[in-house]
Amino acid sequence: MAHPSQLGFQDAASPMMEELLHFHDHALMVVFLISTFVLYIILTMLTTKLTDKLILESHEIEII
């Protein structure tokens, strides 16, 4: 039986509902892993300073 303060699903009453709960848990784990990986890639790209080693001094100003 569900309680007002319960954050999860009710207990499964049938085998089909139990399988749906397992599928839900698995799908959320996959979504969480993909989101974490994308966040890691974004943070890596924002924090990594990509500089060209061939352009030294102030040559980038001359290019503009």
Curated annotation (Swiss-Prot):
State its role.
Component of the cytochrome c oxidase, the last enzyme in the mitochondrial electron transport chain which drives oxidative phosphorylation. The respiratory chain contains 3 multisubunit complexes succinate dehydrogenase (complex II, CII), ubiquinol-cytochrome c oxidoreductase (cytochrome b-c1 complex, complex III, CIII) and cytochrome c oxidase (complex IV, CIV), that cooperate to transfer electrons derived from NADH and succinate to molecular oxygen, creating an electrochemical gradient over the inner membrane that drives transmembrane transport and the ATP synthase.
What are its E.C. numbers? 7.1.1.9
* Entry GO MF terms: cytochrome-c oxidase activity
The residue spans the entry assigns to the Mitochondrial matrix side of the membrane are as follows 46-64
Which residue ranges run through the membrane? 15-45
State the membrane topology.
Multi-pass membrane protein
Q: Which gene encodes it?
A: mt-co2
Tell me if Iron-sulfur is a UniProt keyword of this record: no
| A Pfam family annotated for this UniProt entry | COX2_TM
Q: How is the cofactor bound?
A: Binds a dinuclear copper A center per subunit.
What keywords is this UniProt entry annotated with? Copper, Electron transport, Membrane, Mitochondrion, Mitochondrion inner membrane, Respiratory chain, Translocase, Transmembrane, Transmembrane helix, Transport
Question: Enzyme class, one word?
Answer: translocase
UniProt family annotation: Belongs to the cytochrome c oxidase subunit 2 family.
As for subcellular location, the record says:
Mitochondrion inner membrane
Q: Which PROSITE patterns match?
A: COX2_TM
One Gene Ontology cellular component term attached to this UniProt record is: respiratory chain complex IV
Cofactors (names): Cu cation
Which InterPro entries does the record cross-reference, listed alphabetically? Answer: Cyt_c_oxidase_su2_TM_dom, Cyt_c_oxidase_su2_TM_sf
Provide Mitochondrial intermembrane-side residue ranges: 1-14
Which reaction(s) are listed as its catalytic activity? 4 Fe(II)-[cytochrome c] + O2 + 8 H(+)(in) = 4 Fe(III)-[cytochrome c] + 2 H2O + 4 H(+)(out)
Q: Name one GO biological process term.
A: electron transport chain
Does the keyword RNA-binding belong to this entry?
Answer: no
Name of this protein:
Cytochrome c oxidase subunit 2
